[in-house]
């Protein structure tokens, strides 16, 4: 499978970033924002070659004059025309391959509407003429990437978080829990609490600046109350950030107040459980005999689990919920930002997986519904 001629393409379409590359590689070749931007103003300069839309990094770099839209919200594709643009950009501009020559592995969030994966299948076969494709569940791929077949995965990206228990390679669908609280909500929350400091961020372009502040400066406190007290008493936790126009902004307790919303969604006005309780609830929905294995193999994946301190805090919170004699291990691989993609790369290059692909022929015979029969 190392030959690029026949290598499968692995495309992990996240709500925030699209990760794409070739099966068998150890990291994605292309990682770019899942954004489509359209000009906010009429072009005035002749011959500038203005386009009617920009995708990914190009949209990001011209964000000042564009309105940015994310076609994937909460892990579900909501704008198919824009999504096609992103796929087109992935194949032709980023990977520079002809999609009709490669099998394509796509990923999706668990508990997604069935119509979503049918439409994905249809577009791959009818628009891009792919010879074969497959749709895999993101969290399952993360577990593969960590070299396990049993464990509970907390996969938290930009648009959706979910906890998926997997036993001997099988996801247990009745115990999957989904939490519509993820990176984008934290970015919005940080925008809101920075406003309290007198910094105003409102446009879609400014939201990207706040996302950068979040990624560079935020962390999870081990003890929130104590950290708040420290922040109030001294300036030791303050950090500064230089905005694109040279202004310098200072942020203090916002650094840990923002990701604290993962553990206390009430900060965002949400009534759901925090991520620690969600993991615990997922484990409790599983058979009593396998819980011990799940507690000992709790795997974090996705960009929103990248905050410093999150693994220790998870350990502390789950220890408080679980029976006292049980061994709890939180696995936070350093490459977890891309572990879904890496798992897809592993899966698509397994010799045993080759009979799992949905071929163009099968699609022509059965239609898009085949995806529910062939892909778990």
Curated annotation (Swiss-Prot):
Recorded catalytic activity of this chain's protein: ATP + H2O = ADP + phosphate + H(+)
Residues with PTM N-acetylaspartate = 3
User: Which CDD domains does the UniProt entry name for this protein?
Assistant: ASKHA_NBD_actin
Methionine sulfoxide PTM positions read 45, 48
Which ranges of the sequence are coiled-coil?
none
Location comes to:
Cytoplasm, Cytoskeleton
Propeptide residues, per UniProt? 1-2
Tell me yes or no: is NAD among this UniProt entry's keywords: no
SMART domains for the chain: ACTIN (SM00268)
Q: Which Pfam families match?
A: Actin (PF00022)
Q: Name one GO molecular function term.
A: ATP binding
Family according to the record = Belongs to the actin family.
Described function: Actins are highly conserved proteins that are involved in various types of cell motility and are ubiquitously expressed in all eukaryotic cells. Multiple isoforms are involved in various cellular functions such as cytoskeleton structure, cell mobility, chromosome movement and muscle contraction.
Additional information: There are at least 4 actin isoforms expressed during artemia development.
Name of the protein this chain belongs to: Actin, clone 205
**Native organism:** Artemia sp. (Brine shrimp)
